Amino acid sequence: MLAKKAKRVYGIELEPEASRCADSLKAKNGLDNMFNICGYVEEHLAGVMEKEKGEKLRLILDPPRAGIARSVVKALLASGIPQMTLISCNPATLARDLGILTGKLIENEAGELVKNPAYDGVADGEILPGYYAIEKIQPYDMFPQTKHVETIVCLRKQ
C-alpha cells in the first residue's frame, strides 16, 4: 500500500517468518522500491536514516508489547523525521513511549524516567521544540470480548 506511493519503503522486522512473508509479498506485487531487513530496529534504524538522509521521511512504528527500545526513542528524537505513526498493543508502554516522545518524561542520571522540569509553566497542549506532538490518537478494538486493544497515534515533530 505505502510502497506504491513512496520512493522507497523499508521494513525492519525481527521475526524471520514475517520478514520472509514481506519478501514474498514484495515479489508478488513487483515492489522494487521495498527493502525488508530482518533484525532489531535498534540495530538497523540509524543505517536506514543515514542512507535516506535529506529525503522526506515518514515512519510507521509497531513495537512489541514491551514498547519502543530507549535507543530507538533517542534515535527518533535526534532524527529529522517530521511525522510518525505509532501502533501499540499495550496502553501502559504506549503512555510511557508517548511521554518520552513528547518530552514530558526524561531519563535522569540513574536511568529512571521522571517528569521533565522544562514543562513546568508550559501551557497545556504546548510541545517543546525537538519533541513530537500528538495529532491524533485512536484506539481499535480488534479483539472483541478481550482486554486487548490496538492504538494508532499520529505524531508530528515540533
Whereabouts are the PLM-identified features?
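Rossmann-like S-adenosyl-L-methionine
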Residues: M1-Q158
